[in-house]
Structure formats: structure tokens, C-alpha cells
Amino acid sequence: MAQVLHVSAPFPGTPGPASPPAFPSKEPDVPYSVETPYGYRLDLDFLKYVDDIEKGHTLRRVAVQRRPRLGSLPRGPGSWWTSTESLCSNASGDSRHSAYSYCGRGFYPQYGALETRGGFNPRVERTLLDARRRLEDQAAAPAGLGSLTPSAAGSTSSLVGVGLPPPTPRGSGLSTPVPPSAGHLAHVREQMAGALRKLRQLEEQVKLIPVLQVKLSVLQEEKRQLTVQLKSQKFLGHPAGARGRGELCLDLPEAPEDPVTLETRSVGTWVRERDLGMPDGEAALAAKVAVLETQLKKALQELQAAQARQADLPPQAWPPPDSPVRVDTVRVVQGPREVEVAASTAAGAPAQRAQSLEPYGAGLRALATSNGAESPPVFRSHEVMETVFPAPTASTSNVHQVKKISITERSCDGAAGHPQAPAESSLSPPESEGATQAQPEKNTGQVPAHDDTTIKEPIRQAACHESEFEEAGGAGGAQAGLRSIMKQKEEPTDPEAHRRSLQFVGVNGSISPRYESSSEDSSTAENFSDNESTENEAPEPEERVPSVAEAPQLRPKETAKAKTSREESQLPQESLHTPTAEGASGSSAKDEIRMELSPDLISACLALEKYLENPKALTERELKVAYTTVLQEWLRLACRSDAHPELVRRHLVTFRAMSARLLDYVVNIADSNGNTALHYSVSHANFPVVQQLLDSGVCQVDKQNRAGYSPIMLTALATLKTQDDIQTILQLFRLGDVNAKASQAGQTALMLAVSHGRVDVVKALLACEADVNVQDDDGSTALMCACEHGHKEITALLLAVPSCDISITDRDGSTALMVALDAGHSEIASMLYSRMNIKCSFAPMSDDESPASSSAEE
């Protein structure tokens, strides 16, 4: 076997073994052995080993000792083998010393220069321990405990220890040798061979560790490069797609696919409407026709009743007019399902309205002032029946359902010297005056027939913005819920035959109505009134047109509001006069202003109106759609920098005609940032639109956006160009709170205007009694802002205010004078210093007068 050195560990109370002598200088004889992969030498003298095993010298009871600590092991090159009792013969177990075999190749002098491998393999150790236990158990089974003792005749050539206790003699009776069987020996040899094979495998695996480490470092480097490349792609904005983390995307070019032609064939499928679940169109139309016929019959009955009442009234002569009047044609055409009524208005003083309509044909009435003695001659054609009606004397409760109202006007003037239209110059001669005077007596309106709309003596068109028809209809519509809107037809190109044709269309109730209006030479904003409505609307049962007799009763309650709305929508009177050739050519060059409300906007407005009246009338989805539509259309119209004030005004009139609540809601509607139309208009310095919004009377001027600024505060960003702009912001300041603070920094409109150097805005704010001593969150005042930014003129304006206090300090304890000195504005500092000296000189007098002044203020 290998050279074995038994070292006994010293235990307390036990004398330690003698130290082994030093190795002789002469190299000992190396027995026939083999070197293991880890530097161990195994004795291959199997004959002697087998002989020892047969004699039982190697089989003895050895107590399994714990592995010694590293500190108690001898230092030096080599490897410890803690369980070599089965490999080294004649190991004494009676001394109870822990025997360790020090079989390292570096222990010997001839192998000291070679590189050794440190450590031990626990798997080999466990294998050897198991083999030793099995041999001991098998040997101890027949003999009992303590029967296994080494033989004195055993081979001791492998023991090198000196001073060890002598082996126990065989005749001592401590143990009885039991020769092992051949199977045990074969089993031990197999275990040793398997342990060697496992050692070789482990050694090969250890050799692969550096290669794997190199591969790992290469993969880590590739990962780092890919991570950098991915980050660069994200930075450049390339979409990463839906790939997972660590997944690579390889863009491989693909061969272009051949275009595939698909044959298509249209296939028609016959489906019945009732199978699709669609409503029956014919049934719905039949129901509408029945409703219209019923309304028509009712209107005809009321018309006949009105004619009967008119026949009972005494006739009354009409005095001749002394002022220009307007001749209007009222035509009632009877049809199976529809009634068409044409009417227009009179000018000048308040005139009288015809009280009855004939069931067949139409009547022509002349409206004039009460002064005069003769009535103007009137004529009719075979399609028109003319009647001069007296003034109404009694009120009636007639209700007329009107679906379509058209107004036709001709501008003609023969008495005032204006040129007549060519078509009117060739009119046929009128009837005699006597035939005309006989009409009031008969009260039938029968006169000879002539061409339609023929007039013997054209009269001048009156310069009037609103008609009696609008005044009566508007008053009644405000109460009965009638809303109408005018549409202007295109004018002929001939300026001599200037003609204006207006059309009132509709009586409430359409699902998707449409507002449309055009502004041309002779009619613009006056076409709108408070009783505007939608086009092609079906009449609702609860809505009705007020009768003629009801109009005077409705006027006292509704006239003030109607007149105010009409005055806002009027243009100068010159636009209604007959234009000359020069005026017509100049007016044709004007830009046409058109207002068209989409069906979606009208439907959304009607839905919001229902919601404002009843919050449970709409679902959440319907409310969201209506709100979004109105918000987008209103912001597109009124919140742009180039918004047209006339279009804004017309929309406001339309919203007011629908509902006052709707007008308030739309004007103050805000976007996602909390900005209303007033915020945007003030920011864009579009003060004509601001004026229209303020004139609506429902604008919330103190409403703050999410940034905490109100429209009054945003005037600091605007530039005032004209005197009208100054008047507009003065009106804005008077309607709101000029001392309101922003929610972010606590600044007021005066501080913002001072910081931006808006002298005009500062003057307007001071004129509206803005407080100059208000402090923001940092304790700064408007005077400190002016001193910091070096606005000398604004500083002078602020110091001119008697209540300006220059001794106020901010959070840092700085006054306005200190701020000016720190900013290097010496002129402003001198102004403040002079003001301070003046204040100090009048301080005693002010102290003496303080009680009197305080009592006077109280």
C-alpha cells in the first residue's frame, strides 16, 4: 500500500503520541503501486493485501470519528483521506486515536516539486465508508461484538508510524478472525473501480468549466449589444411591435408573391322589409297624411268662423297714407294635404293686421298709418282676391296651423322719384277707383282680374327692419312655443329690378331639422327673430300659431324682449332701401356670410334642451353624443382666432330661440382644459366676438379654467387695437370681479397686466377700481411687479392711485423700493423714494385727522 502516516489527535487528559521521526535523507523504496488521478498512490500488491484480509488483520472495530477541523490538521502540501482504514492495513483501533492517512504525493521528497490538487471528493469518501461498514457488519455478525481484532502476524510493512501502541495479540480473546468471502472482495473491487470512473468523469467535467465560462461571457456581451440596439430603436421612434422581452426580430426579405386574381360576382338577395324589422313606411306615411288632413279640416273650419265674424263687423274706410307703406299679398291656396300662406309686413307706425283669411284665393291688404283720407288703389288677377280689411276690434281665439309662409317684396317707387323696374313700367292700366272703393262695402273682395302682382301706382318701399307680422308672430311664438327661421333666396342679377324674397319655413317638431340663412345685399341679420324655428318641421299638438286677435294681448308681455332681440339683429336702414346702380355694384362685391346649422347640431341641441328640462330624459350615451357634438361645433365656430362675430351672433339668436337654458349652457360650455368661448376669444384678442358673448347676458365672466385663470385675467395677454376693444374690456371688467385671484399663484388681473406691460389694460382695470394692494402667494403686489420688470409708466399709474401702499413687504421682507434697487431700476427707485418722502411729510397731519377721517368713513 501507499506510505501511510498515522497521526493521533491529542485529546484532553490523554498523553499525546510521540512525534514521528524525520524522514531519512535516503529516499525510501517505493513499493509496487499506482498513482490515482488526484495524487494518491494505491498499493497494488494484491497478494499481500488479500493475505492480510484472509488473516483478518485489516478487519477491526474502528470508531467513526468526526472530520477534524481545518485548524487541527497539519499544514503542508497533500490531500487528506479521512477514510483509508479499508485501504491501509493494521490500523489500531484500541487506542481510539483518529488515524488519518496522509497519502499526498507532495508529502514525499521526490514528488514535492510537482503540482498537487487540494481537497477531497465526498462521493468517493462515502463510497469507501459504505464498503467498510458492510465488511464490518458481515464480519461482526457471527462473532459478536469485540471479536474482530487484528492479527499480530498481519502485514505491517505498510505502517510507518513510530511510537504507536503495539497491536493486540491474537490470544487476548478480544476478537476472533473471520475470513471474508470472495464475493466481498469482488464487491470491494467493483466499488473501487466505480469510484475511479466517477473521478475521471468529474475531472472531465471540471475541464469543461472554463469553456462554458467563455461561452457565457460571449452570450452576455451579445445580450448587452442587443439591449443597446433595442434602446436606440426606441429612442429613434421605431415601433417595437408586440414582441416579448429578449425576443429578436429578424427582417428577412421575402420573395414577392404573385398577384392572385379573385373572381367576384354580385349576388342579389330578395328580402322583404318586414323580415328586416324595419318600420312600415306606407303605414307611417298614411298616419302622417291622416294627421295633416285633420289639421287642414280644423284650420278651414276656423277660417270659415273667422270669415263669419268678419262679415258681422261694420265696414270702415281706410284713410289715404301720408307716409310710405308696404303692399303685401296674402294668398291662401287650398290643397288636399297642405296649406300655403303668404304674408309680409308693414312699415312706419304700428299698423293693423288683417283678421281673416278667405278659404279660396287670397287677399291684398295695404297697411298704413292712421293719418290720411284715401286708401291706395289695389288690383288683383284671376288668381288673387283682394280685400281691404278694417282694424280689428275684438279678440278671438282662432288658431291657425301654418306649415309654410312665404314673403315676396318688390322695391318700387314712383312717387319718390326712384327709377322703376322695367317689368313694372309695362303694367296694364288699373281698374277704376270706384270699383276699388266699393270693396269695403261689399266686404267680399271681388274686383276685376288682372295679371298677378300688378300695381297701378308703385309706392316706395319703407325703411323698416321688422314687420308687423314678425312682431305679432314673435310675441305669440314666445308664448306658444313657435319657432321659425328665414331663408333668403338669391337675388336677380339685374340691379334695376331689385327684388327681395324672404321665406319663413316651418313650425316646430322635426327630428333632424336644418337651419339655413344667407346674408346678401338687402337682408342680413334682421332676418332673425326670437321666433326662429327649423325647416321641414311637423307641427306639434301643443304648439300653435296665435291668431290675429291674440297678438295685441301678447304684445305687452313679450314686446320688450322681442324688440331687444330685433334691435340686435338689425343692420343700418340704408340696406333696405332700393339700391342704385352704383350701390348694387358695390354691394355685390361684399363677402357673403352664410350660416348653416347641420342636422346633427340641431338634434344635439334639442337633446340637450330635453336634458336641461328633465335630466332623466336622456341616457348617458345619448347625453355624451349630444354634448360632444355641441361642444365641437361651438368651439369650431366661436373659439378660433378668425371667428366671425356675425356668425356667432346668429347662432346665439338661434340658441335663444330654442331655449334660454340651452343658450346659457352652450355659451358657458368648456373643453377638457376648462376654457370657454370667452377664454379663447379674449386670448385671441377677438373682441367683436367677446362683445357678442357679453351681449348674450348669460356669459360667466369669472369662470376659471383648470390653470386657474378667468377671462378677465387673460386680458393681460391681449392687445387692444381700437377704442371699441377698450369699451369691450371695460364692459367685461364691470361684469366680473377684477380682484379675483388665480388658483395657482394667487395673482390678479392687475398683476398679470403689469407683468406683461399692458398699459391700456392697466388703465382699464384701475378705472374699474382694481385693488393695487392685493398680494399674491409670495406677498408681491402689482407695484412690486412693475418695479421688478422696470415698467416706469405703469409704476407712475399705480403710484397715482391714492390707496397705493408702498410700504407693503413680501415674504422675504422686501418692499417695492428694495425690489427696484435690486433690479437696478434707479428711476423707478427715485419715484418711490419721492413718494415715501411726501408720505412722511404728511404723516403728522394724517395722524391728527385720522379720527375724523375714520368717523367720516363710518
From Swiss-Prot:
Phosphoserine sites (modified residues): 19, 83, 86, 89, 92, 323, 356, 375, 547
Family matches, as Gene3D superfamilies: Ankyrin repeat-containing domain
Biased composition (Low complexity): 421-435, 509-528
Coiled-coil residue windows: 183-234, 282-313
UniProt-annotated location(s): Cytoplasm; Mitochondrion
Post-translational modification: Phosphorylated by casein kinase II upon estrogen stimulation. Phosphorylation induces the release by KANK2 of NCOA1 and its translocation to the nucleus where NCOA1 can activate gene transcription.
Skewed-composition ranges (Pro residues): 12-23
InterPro entries the UniProt entry points to: Ankyrin_rpt, Ankyrin_rpt-contain_sf, KANK1-4, KN_motif
Biased composition (Polar residues): 148-159, 436-446
Ranges where the record places region Interaction with AIFM1: 1-72
Extent of the ANK repeats: 621-658, 673-703, 707-740, 745-774, 778-808, 812-842
Transmembrane segments: none
Record PTM Omega-N-methylarginine, positions in chain: 105
Record PTM Phosphothreonine, positions in chain: 168, 329, 559
BP GO terms, sorted: apoptotic process; kidney epithelium development; negative regulation of actin filament polymerization; negative regulation of cell population proliferation; negative regulation of G1/S transition of mitotic cell cycle; negative regulation of intracellular estrogen receptor signaling pathway; negative regulation of programmed cell death; negative regulation of transcription by RNA polymerase II
Region (Interaction with NCOA1) residue spans: 676-842
Known role: Involved in transcription regulation by sequestering in the cytoplasm nuclear receptor coactivators such as NCOA1, NCOA2 and NCOA3. Involved in regulation of caspase-independent apoptosis by sequestering the proapoptotic factor AIFM1 in mitochondria. Pro-apoptotic stimuli can induce its proteasomal degradation allowing the translocation of AIFM1 to the nucleus to induce apoptosis. Involved in the negative control of vitamin D receptor signaling pathway. Involved in actin stress fibers formation through its interaction with ARHGDIA and the regulation of the Rho signaling pathway.
Subunit structure: Interacts (non-phosphorylated form) with NCOA1; NCOA2 AND NCOA3. Interacts with AIFM1. Interacts with ARHGDIA; the interaction is direct and may regulate the interaction of ARHGDIA with RHOA, RAC1 and CDC42. Interacts (via ANK repeats 1-5) with KIF21A.
Protein's name according to its UniProt entry: KN motif and ankyrin repeat domain-containing protein 2
Organism, scientific name: Bos taurus (Bovine)
